[in-house]
Amino acid sequence: MPSSLFADMERNGSGGGGGETLDDQRALQIALDQLSLLGLDNDESAMYDNEPRKKSINMTECVQVPSSEHVAEIVGRQGCKIKALRAKTNTYIKTPVRGEEPVFVVTGRKEDVALARREIISAAEHFSMIRASRNKNAAALNGGSVPAPPNLPGQTTIQVRVPYRVVGLVVGPKGATIKRIQQQTHTYIVTPSRDKEPVFEVTGMPENVDRAREEIEAHIAVRTGGLIEVADENDFHANGTDVGFDLHGSLWSKSNQSSGSRKALSNYRNDSSSSLGSASTDSYFGGTRMADYSPPSPDLSYTNNNNNNNGNGYVYSTGISPDCTDLTFESGFDPAPAPPPSAYTWSQLERSTGSAPYHNNANGILLNQRRLNGVGCTTAPRLSPPLHTCNGLSEHPLARRVRSDPGGGLSYSAYSNMACDSSSSSSSSSSSSSSSSSSSSSSSSSGMRRKGSRECSICFESEVIAALVPCGHNLFCMECANRICEKNQPQCPVCHAGVTQAIRIFS
């Protein structure tokens, strides 16, 4: 239509006013073209009558919530909840910033804005109910009364108390652990605040609540290595020490004990004074006597089985054994049951019958011991003082190597056998009373010492009363031993080993 009109106007244009008429016609043509492109012709006028009504559907509404805490709950962590609500309702929701009024501004179509408004108000009411339940339970705890039952039928609320130091462990990083427990058990768990008691409130169905409590306790056990007892009498568990030995008690218990009577190491251990030699075994044997504070010896805890378990926690090879295994000892625990024969205690060493007197210093270290090899006695390398001797004389620990040292080339087996036989005969012929037996043993020992005294291997005049360190050869008098040590390069005349000092042997 516009092109034909333009052709007609060109054909009809004439005269002086034709130029103006042509310009007017061209302007009219351009206007008609623009109107046709915009669709404002009469045929389509009815379709655009509703255009103002379509634009009026987009609207903006303000939705107010009670507090800024409600805003934080509705927005969610890093805006995750509000983003989901925007996508669900196809609206734009402007969240209030901190310090402003808690009002959400929702923009969109009318029905979408109404849906977003209902969602926001529902979330705010739900959070208000949760806050009211928390305040009610807190008031019940402070008032000492029983918490009110939950609103929903069939649900129950329990309290799970944990130690203060594991509250953060149960909550987890950014609440991940407690959320996982809630999702797995289908419960709602209220975590304790910093200024309240360490009690988790678990709400849900009874079986789900029990599962949640078990999950919390299991998580604490896994992360700390063992179950934590919060009883007042168990202060070791309360302050965070000795946790986790219950699971591995079989590794530390005595080998001869049955599994039914076995106890954890946390109940059978030395305190901070164990380095000073306190080793109480009352908790292990179930006795009520006072603790025996004599020093524990690794050699006294020798076990004759192959797993090398002992009560003191020391582990030694099977080659370390007492000298004479055919002797019996009386128990060191009067009111309690007798311990296994493989676990000797230090007190039994002091109470063994017929043994020579021992000289102890303040630290309980055996100083002067004389051990003689006899019938039925087997010698083995030792890491600690011997358990007992052959009812005879004791020898210094550094000087007794001459008895079993083949490098020295000097053997006194005849003298040793004579000493053991004489000592055994004197003890067997003594009376049944302990006093007469000990006096007979001491007299025979003193007589044997005078009879078997030796002369110095250098001067052949004085009695042998000195030994060289570290080789331990006791073949010299004190004067000759000192002269050996005073040389420029002191060495033992027997084994030619370096000598650091000479010690006097007291019998």
Swiss-Prot record:
It is found in: Cytoplasm; Nucleus; Cytoplasmic granule; Cytoplasm, P-body. PROSITE patterns: KH_TYPE_1 (PS50084), ZF_RING_2 (PS50089). InterPro entries: KH-I_MEX3_rpt1, KH-I_MEX3_rpt2, KH_dom, KH_dom_type_1, KH_dom_type_1_sf, MEX3, Znf_RING, Znf_RING/FYVE/PHD. Keywords: Cytoplasm, Metal-binding, Nucleus, Repeat, RNA-binding, Zinc, Zinc-finger. A zinc finger (RING-type) spans 456-496. Pfam families: KH_1, zf-C3HC4_3. Residues 59-120, 155-216 form the KH domain. GO terms for molecular function: RNA binding; zinc ion binding. Residues 1-22, 256-279, 426-450 are annotated as: Disordered. CDD domains: KH-I_MEX3_rpt1, KH-I_MEX3_rpt2, RING-HC_MEX3B. GO terms for cellular component: nucleus; P-body. Residues 426-446 have a biased composition (Low complexity). Signal peptide: none annotated. Binds RNA through its KH domains. This is RNA-binding protein MEX3B. It comes from Xenopus laevis (African clawed frog). The gene is mex3b.
